[in-house]
Each structure stands twice: as C-alpha cells, then as structure tokens.
Amino acid sequence: TGYVGCFPTEFIGSGSGSASMLAVALAYVAVFFAVGAVATRSPKQPGPAKKHHGLELLDASVGYGSTTILSIGSLFLSPGTAAGLVAPNGSGKTTLLEALSGQFPTRIRSGSLAADGICQRRSAEFAELVYLSSSGGADLYPTLSAIEHLAFVREAWKSAADIDSLCDSLGISPYLDKPTRKLSTGMKQQVKLAMAIATGCPYLILDEPLNGLDPGKRKTSCDAMRSEVARGRSVLISSHLLDDLADLTNSFYFIEAGTLVEKIKSSSQTLKQEYLDTYEGGE
C-alpha cells in the first residue's frame, strides 16, 4: 500500500518513469469514481461517543534511511488539548510529524507509538484515529474540487461531519466547486484544514496549517481548531507564527540539539524570547 496525497492506495508502486505515471493516473481515476459515489451521500449518524486516552510516542528515535535525527523521551497528547511544535527549518519537525501519523512507519527507528492504546503496528485501526495534514499541496489532487476532497475524506473515515457547516465556518463555501489547482495557497490551506476536521479523527497532526494565510484567515483557522479542541479532539501544530501558537495551544515542544523538549504554557512574548534564547543566542 502506498499513498497519493493523504489517501492510501494499492495503485502506487516503487517503479519510475511511464509506469509510475500510469500508476498515479490510475489512482486519480480510482479516487474520482470513489468521490463521485459518495459526494451526495448524507453523513453517517454518530454512534455512542468513544472514550479517548491520548496519543503517545515513548522512548523513541526518529529519522529516515540510516540517519537518526531526533530523540524523544515522551510526547503525549491528551484528549482536548492543543500543542505546538516549534523549531527552525531543518530541525526535523516534518519527520517527527510523519512518524506520529503512522503513515511512515520507517520514521520510527526505536520506541513505541500508540493512540488510545492501539499500537501503530495495527495500522488500519491506528489510521482511523490519527490524521496528518502535510505542508505544501501533497494532500490535494489538482483536478478534483474542494467539495470532492471533503466528501472523500468523510466517507473514507466514516465521519459524521457536517460539511456545509464546516465550510461556512472556514469561509470556503464560495470556491468548493473549483478544482484545487485553481485555488490560491491560502485557499488550499483552508481546504486542507477542513479535510482534517472532516475526518472526525480524534488526533490531528497539522504541519504549518497557517502558512500563506492573511491575518483574518489565520484567525478563522485558529478559531476552527480551538472549537475542535473544545469538542475533545487533540491537535499538534507546527508553525513559526508564535503569536498564534501562544494563543491557541496548551503546551509547546521545542527541538533542541536533536532532542524533543516540552515547554510549559507561556505568553506570546515569553515564547518569542525563549525561541530567541534557544535558537539564536538570545538576540
């Protein structure tokens, strides 16, 4: 099983050239028909609420290939909390987020990862609980519309999300029918956040979700994330926008010399100063 965007597919192999291009084309076709079949369905009615216990990475080393880049004693996301991940570019933030998602099992070189007590090795069950929204446009199919993406993730994760209300709250309703290749960077970011919320997953891992947004749209996105946390979901957010992170999150993780370090909740000014002290020698 491979991935096209954020969606698992059996079509993707390890080949290259025309064979890989054909595989990707087939994956697009498969998703197109899947979306067409579910786009007009009503969401499933929610069943009894499930009790969540947290997402935990313990005594782990994280990296890629033969390289270990991070050591983690403990990273724990309890239900109904938001945490920030703060570090300069190239420190390993994205690698860590990929490891936490379970989509990239080779990122975890040692240690254990579990969501609600379900080990990442039980990948199908784990994938129902944890969703990664990656940076850039890798989560989006350029020829499919925003509403098709949302319908697909709602069905794939068997979610009861109210797509209309979600789109209204994020202000993306006016361009739902546009193919994502015609959307601006900010519009794509909001569609990706809507997709993450629409999955219904209790644990959302968001890589730079506020990049490319103007101040008004950043506030809208932060309000949406805050609402999901109030409903009991857990959110881990990487960002360089320290003011927004300080306002949104309960705690922070810094990456210091290849080690993940948890910080206490602090004000925006304190967080900025701690960032400067840690990474820029207190300038």
Describe these PLM feature segments.
Residues 86-88:
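The feature captures the beta-strand-to-loop junction immediately N-terminal to the Walker
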Residues 102, 106-126, 262:
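Conserved ABC transporter NBD signature motif
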Residues 132, 142-156:
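Q-loop/switch helix immediately C-terminal to the Walker
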Residues 151, 160-176:
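Conserved ABC ATPase "signature" region
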Residues 193:
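Hydrophobic anchor residue at the start of the ABC signature
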Residues 204-208:
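Catalytic Walker B motif of ABC-type/P-loop ATPase nucleotide-binding domains
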Residues 238-240:
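H-loop/switch region of ABC-family ATPase nucleotide-binding domains
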